UniProtKB/Swiss-Prot annotation:
Keywords (A to Z) from UniProt: ATP-binding, Cell cycle, Cell division, Cell shape, Cell wall biogenesis/degradation, Cytoplasm, Ligase, Nucleotide-binding, Peptidoglycan synthesis
Entry keyword Cell wall biogenesis/degradation: yes
Cellular location(s): Cytoplasm
GO biological process assignments: cell division; cell wall organization; peptidoglycan biosynthetic process; regulation of cell shape
Family statement: Belongs to the MurCDEF family.
Function (record text): Cell wall formation.
Coiled-coil annotated residue ranges, if any: none
Record's protein name: UDP-N-acetylmuramate--L-alanine ligase
Amino acid sequence: MSTSAKALTKRLIEIPEMRRIQHLHFIGIGGSGMCGIAEVMNNQGYKVSGSDITESLVTKRLEQIGIDINIGHDSKNIANADVIVVSSAIDRSNPEVKAALEARLPVVRRADMLGELMRYRHGIAIAGAHGKTTTTSLLTTMMAEGNLDPTYVIGGKLNASGKNAALGSSRFLIAEADESDASFLSLHPMAAIVTNIDQDHMETYGNSFDKLKAAYIQFLQNMPFYGLAVVCGDDPELYAMIDDIGRPVLTFGLEPFNDVQAVDLVTEGTKTHFTVLRRDHEPLRLTLNIPGVHNVYNALAAITMATDEGVDDAAITRALQKFEGVGRRFEQHASVTIDDGDVLLIDDYGHHPKEVDATIKAARQSFPERRLVMLFQPHRYSRTRDCFDDFVEVLSSVDELLLLDVYSAGESPIAGADTKALARSIRLRGAVEPTIVDKKNIAAVMQRLLKANDMLITQGAGNVGQIAIELAANDLYIK
């Protein structure tokens, strides 16, 4: 059988009704939600191409695995494509979208493409305001350790594999479900996890928390009646929704009424030891290689689902011991020697006040002797406005605070929701004196500010992660 025939056979097995599609083009392919799906489709034997406005480590890696990448958007980029896949950030004014519509090519959302991948598999979708990426990564690691070899699509790089996604040999597909644009409603999984609910991305839901909660219920009701919902019982909003789900439910948390409970938590550096109590199972003592109580919750969610899917305790134990974390989730980048000590650089993606607070608490627990210096980049003017007071409170708890300009993510500025306003309010609170920095003065600020045995945390969902890489490459500018 020829190579092309083998590839076609593979595609027909994976997604039988997509036999008419040979070439998929992804607009915005460098995005965290797009690159994983593109990689899975490439691994299944489809021709995959993509475009993005800027080159990145992600686009470079996709090129290395054989995906054609164009930097910049141009109608010529979609030549010979059969279908166009777009992220929620791409609108009809994009020249590639315009060309596709003129050519009568189907233009589908990322979530719809993920939904097609999931339709022919045993899909497990992970939703929630916080912790989706880590929970998805933990569950993937557990099921792989249990020899279930799942396909996975994650919103961050799994450090152990260096990938956002991989094609497995089993029927399992594990994927993040994105509530930010309500696209998770396009998914129809066999089982689902909801880590928590919070008032974020409220513009999608008409600034109505009730509409947001109703969307989560609809997401869970997209499962068949024999599916399984795994939800955090310690989240009062989630717990109050259980009776409306209409599907089998298992709860997890630290409170004793949960189906799966963690007790006897002990922090040891960046590790957390805890015991899991489950009905009809012996207590299981575990060690998690990432810090923070929030990550114990993420681990509990994954353990609950993995146990139900038949992963044994030995595999769960090995998975947690081996887990190397996720890119930009409390990722330790560098340790730079200075005077009689060092400065530790940690990078974290968290951009909501609760996520930033969780990072700060995990850092304090892991490195209590270090001074905490945070370089924070607010993400979106709307989030800065909606969570302004919470940001002021949380950011006031660090020892030194550096603030970058708001990463707009395409939004127009909002009066009173910029970095200067945030700095003024934090200064008035009196706990810490914020310093506004940019790329031009960051080197001088680091040289002046950092001391032996500090930890510097770069925090946010914008391009601050790239700044962390540059800081690490230049020894934090302190040498």
